[in-house]
Amino acid sequence: MAKPYDPKDFYYRKAKKQGLRARSAFKIEEILHRHRLLGRGDAVLDLGAAPGGFLQILAEAVGEKGVAVGVDLEPIRNLGKRWVRTAIVDLLAPDALDKIRLLHDGRFRLVTSDMAPKTIGIKVTDEARSLELVRMALSVAEQVLVPGGAFVAKVFMGGDFPALKRELQGRFAAMHVIRPEAVRESSYEVYVLGTGFRGRAAAVAPAAVKAEAPRAPAPPEQAAAPEEATAPATRAARQKPAPAKKPAAAKRPAARKRAAKKPARRA
């Protein structure tokens, strides 16, 4: 049986001692240490940023020449750094991207998400809701990442997790599953990391290829397309003799001759 969550565990106390807002700060710190995702002057977007644990580490990583944007449904207390910008944003709202672009009108080198659903204790349901949040974050990332950028998101591993991995593999050059040391022993959360973003067009292509791959007759269908394209020309070629119905025109004079002969007989 899993150990009950102790809010005052080692990482909780360590975070408080270092002035960090949440123990999650150590998770993103470890990921950044293991993978070079950000540099000074870069722009980073943190989704579900409250209370600001991730954002504190990300802001330090990009420095004062960079931009760190954090959005959440809850207000995020000011970090006291001019290059950190926050806002209350509902990612499901149609104007979510517009609000994000008001904070930074360029693209981002990294998009992170530490969002988690309100768990109800039913593992299958919690996993499904977690996957929904990751896919929502990924949808935002696809629209704001620079080519070659990276995506990090927390997810409860299980259920449809293999499908999520395939989605990430189709969108990024490399995909990793990371379990930072700061994750509670009883938790089944991990972080997925995609690096080398290929762009939105590439994100659609792999899925299309997989959908078409099982169709063995696909090449013949492609060959049939030109035939359909040329079919009207063939029909037109067959119809070319139609205007030249000169035999009918030739019969008309004959009919006139017969009509002319009739009066002669009467005479």
Swiss-Prot record:
EC number: 2.1.1.166
Keyword Ion transport: no
InterPro entries attached to this UniProt entry: RNA_methyltr_RlmE, RNA_MeTrfase_FtsJ_dom, rRNA-MeTfrase_E, SAM-dependent_MTases_sf
Residue segments, region Disordered: 212-267
Catalytic reaction equation(s): uridine(2552) in 23S rRNA + S-adenosyl-L-methionine = 2'-O-methyluridine(2552) in 23S rRNA + S-adenosyl-L-homocysteine + H(+)
Matching Pfam families: FtsJ
Residues bound to S-adenosyl-L-methionine: 52, 54, 72, 90, 114
Top-rank taxon: Bacteria
Residue spans of biased composition, Basic residues class: 253-267
Positions with biased composition (Low complexity): 212-252
GO CC list: cytoplasm
Keywords: Cytoplasm, Methyltransferase, rRNA processing, S-adenosyl-L-methionine, Transferase
PANTHER family listed in its UniProt record: PRE-RRNA 2'-O-RIBOSE RNA METHYLTRANSFERASE FTSJ3 (PTHR10920:SF13), RIBOSOMAL RNA METHYLTRANSFERASE (PTHR10920)
Sequence similarity: Belongs to the class I-like SAM-binding methyltransferase superfamily. RNA methyltransferase RlmE family.
HAMAP family in the record: RNA_methyltr_E
Role played: Specifically methylates the uridine in position 2552 of 23S rRNA at the 2'-O position of the ribose in the fully assembled 50S ribosomal subunit.
Protein name: Ribosomal RNA large subunit methyltransferase E
Taxonomic placement: Bacteria, Pseudomonadati, Myxococcota, Myxococcia, Myxococcales
